[in-house]
């Protein structure tokens, strides 16, 4: 009665269903009792890392993480990053991985601060040099942020099963490699709209976890819009007591109840982001997109902070204002002449700025029709609000509409370009206007960065059917749209010198929970992360190279419990690993023998076979959570049953095959003693 103790390999087999198997990458070997193995393929000329590093040189041999491995820090400043790495590695490996200082030894991971000459071109402080050899792995960076980015690369150099939240057999190997890496742009963001549909702090923290793994460094949090105001503002209880009651669809389509965060919630999200080296930038859109503010405060005649006549804040289409829980835009505006407008906005800006880690504060500024506010009145509000933001030591950011006629914002203010060229609307004026005014530009052209757009749309095509819009992408925006563009040349007159970075925008009209958000965000945000990080010259290998490196991320996202769209543009991989423990009781095996990742492939289309190591083979049963129209399938289990006739040591081989994708093999050793 003993159990599976030795797993001796995982390999990808170049075969399709019905073809002759040819093993092109395999690894076998024995490990200590109770360990196991999942040997990865030999190192390729280009490790499957996204974003693609600036420079990669592959060496000979592999580093193996073992029970003796430690994480060695060169200074206390590296300790938090080391703790994060240890916490990440421990569940799948089962290793203690103590964090120590002093000299390193064989099998250690070293995190140290320094000034490598190779990082001289880096102006962000996020660069790192990673050296992996059979003896140790060393990450050197000028800042803890750079160490953190290097750790994200370590994660991807390890086999995908390192992302498992439960014990896996290993072995945990890294190819010998020398990597020099630093970002193209200092700003690489993701915007999440929690106003149109409320999202919990826990959901936002989960997005931070996954975005930071791909070196995204900014969370732009859209906390207010026509349909809801989501953060408590002291002195103005109605903003959340009234302003948070609904979301898009509350008037009968989905009956979404809305919600809000306390300031403690907001601070917790900021702290979680900081631990992942992301800053949080709040946005309260003004002077438009604020029906929730106006409805909340219009009748707030008892608030001592207001002058008793708060109705003068309303310059909207409707007077008195009315809730509108559709996705309509362009019907609300705050009056720039109202003292009450400035009392409310000043409180919001001061309180959110004080709680936020970003050096920037976003004033919004988009989609205000001249029928509500003339350009002069619009510019007056933008200019005055910009002065408040600057007075708090923050830099103004807003949608690129804020670069229009009459606005006079401080040099270095940031315009977020969003409106792509289309027909009679060239869309480029806001970008060139911003540059002419000495502003920096964050590039977010909707047809390349808007994560709320459908993946595919057209006659008889609607993916996903229940989520997403298509106004910016008439036929849909799949991963290729997010990858195949260059921020430094996209708008004539807006060059790399003007571009601060890129940002993906997850607007909230159709997403009601984290699963919806993840499905729309991933894998497209990964493509955008590479656009923002990797030098354009290093992306000349093309989209097919990116897709090859993207393919393993399907297993990693699945193991992390993150929903995503298994786009057919990617040849998603099968990845299999034997169970860490397979009980053999009185010679009988019955139950799970392996776990299998197969993004976008139904369990019914996968064939598994188990060679039990005693000259018998039987079919395995593949089972797990099936996909839906807005969820990827889950991790599958391969199960089998077998009875051994006599005690002994048995080398078991488990093979999984699906149409159109290479088969995969994992091996394990079972020992049965009476």
Regions found by a protein language model. Give the residues of each.
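Secretory targeting and sorting signals
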Residues: 1-41
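Active-site neighborhood of glycoside hydrolase catalytic domains
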Residues: 322-413, 419-420, 425-438
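Conserved, mostly hydrophobic/aromatic
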Residues: 71, 143, 190, 211, ...
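Feature activates predominantly on carbohydrate-active enzymes
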Residues: 123-332, 340, 350-360
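Extracellular/lumenal mature domains of secreted and surface-exposed proteins
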Residues: 572-674
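Flexible, acidic glycine-rich loops studded with aromatic residues
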Residues: 401, 408-413, 418-573, 673
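Contiguous, structured surface segment used for ligand recognition
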Residues: 41-185, 516, 532-560
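Hydrophobic faces of well-ordered beta-strands that scaffold small-molecule active sites
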Residues: 188-192, 219-221, 280-284, 361-363, ...
């Amino acid at each position: 009665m003993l159990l599976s103790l030795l797993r001796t390999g995982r390999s990808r087999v170049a075969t399709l269903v019905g073809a002759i198997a040819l093993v092109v990458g395999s690894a076998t070997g024995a490990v200590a009792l109770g360990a196991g193995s999942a040997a990865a393929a030999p190192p390729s000329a280009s490790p499957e890392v996204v974003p693609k590093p600036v420079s990669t040189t592959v060496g000979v041999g592999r580093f193996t993480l073992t029970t003796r491995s430690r994480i060695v820090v060169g200074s206390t400043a590296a300790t938090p990053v080391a703790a994060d790495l240890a916490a990440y590695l421990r569940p799948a490996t089962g290793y203690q991985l103590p964090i120590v200082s002093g000299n390193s030894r064989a099998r250690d991971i070293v995190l140290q601060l320094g000034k490598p000459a190779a990082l001289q071109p880096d102006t962000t402080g996020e660069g790192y040099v990673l050296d992996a050899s059979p003896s140790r792995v060393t990450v050197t960076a000028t800042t803890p942020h750079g160490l953190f980015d290097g750790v994200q690369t370590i994660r991807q150099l390890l086999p995908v099963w390192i992302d498992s939240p439960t014990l896996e057999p290993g072995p945990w190997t890294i190819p010998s490699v020398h990597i020099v890496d630093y970002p193209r742009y200092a700003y690489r963001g993701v915007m999440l709209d929690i106003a149109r549909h409320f999202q919990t702090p826990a959901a936002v923290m989960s997005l931070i976890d996954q975005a930071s793994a791909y070196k995204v460094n900014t969370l732009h949090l859209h906390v207010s819009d026509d349909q809801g105001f989501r953060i408590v503002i002291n002195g103005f209880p109605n903003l959340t007591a009234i302003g948070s009651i609904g979301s898009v669809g509350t008037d009968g389509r989905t009956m979404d109840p809305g919600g809000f965060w306390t300031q403690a919630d907001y601070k917790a999200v900021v702290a979680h982001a900081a631990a992942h080296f992301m800053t949080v930038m709040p946005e309260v859109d003004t002077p438009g997109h604020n029906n929730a503010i106006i409805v909340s405060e219009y009748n707030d005649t008892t608030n001592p902070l207001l002058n008793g006549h708060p109705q003068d804040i309303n310059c909207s289409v409707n007077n008195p204002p009315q809730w509108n829980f559709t996705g309509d835009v362009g019907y609300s505006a705050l009056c720039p002449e109202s003292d009450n407008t400035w009392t409310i906005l000043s409180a919001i800006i001061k309180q959110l700025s004080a709680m936020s880690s970003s050096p920037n504060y976003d004033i919004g500024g988009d989609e205000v029709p001249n029928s509500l506010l003339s350009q002069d009145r619009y510019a007056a509000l933008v200019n005055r609000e910009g002065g408040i933001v600057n007075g708090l030591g923050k830099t103004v950011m807003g949608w690129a509409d804020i670069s229009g006629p009459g606005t006079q914002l401080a040099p270095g203010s940031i315009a977020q370009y969003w409106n792509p060229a289309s027909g009679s609307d060239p869309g480029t004026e806001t970008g060139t206007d911003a540059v002419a005014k000495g502003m920096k530009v964050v590039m977010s052209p909707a047809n390349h960065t808007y994560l709320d757009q459908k993946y595919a749309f057209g006659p008889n095509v609607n993916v996903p059917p229940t989520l997403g819009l298509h106004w910016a992408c008439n036929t849909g925006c799949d991963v290729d749209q997010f990858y195949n563009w260059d921020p430094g040349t996209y708008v004539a007159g807006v060059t790399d010198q003007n571009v601060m970075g890129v940002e993906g925008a997850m607007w909230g009209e159709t997403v009601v929970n984290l699963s919806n958000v993840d499905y729309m965000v991933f894998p497209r945000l990964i493509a955008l992360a590479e656009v923002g990080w990797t030098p354009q010259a290093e992306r000349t290998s093309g989209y097919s190279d990116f897709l090859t490196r993207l393919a393993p991320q399907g297993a990693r996202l699945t193991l992390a419990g993150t929903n995503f769209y298994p786009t057919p543009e990617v040849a998603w991989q099968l990845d299999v690993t034997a169970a860490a423990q397979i009980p053999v009781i009185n010679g009988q095996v019955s139950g799970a023998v392996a776990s299998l990742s197969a993004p976008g492939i139904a369990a019914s289309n996968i064939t598994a076979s188990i060679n039990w190591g005693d000259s018998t083979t039987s079919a395995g049963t593949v089972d797990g959570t099936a996909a839906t129209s807005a969820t990827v399938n889950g991790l599958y289990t391969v199960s089998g049953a077998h009875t051994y006739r006599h005690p002994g040591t048995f080398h078991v081989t488990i093979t999984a095959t699906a149409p159109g994708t290479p088969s995969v093999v994992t091996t394990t050793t079972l020992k049965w003693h009476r």
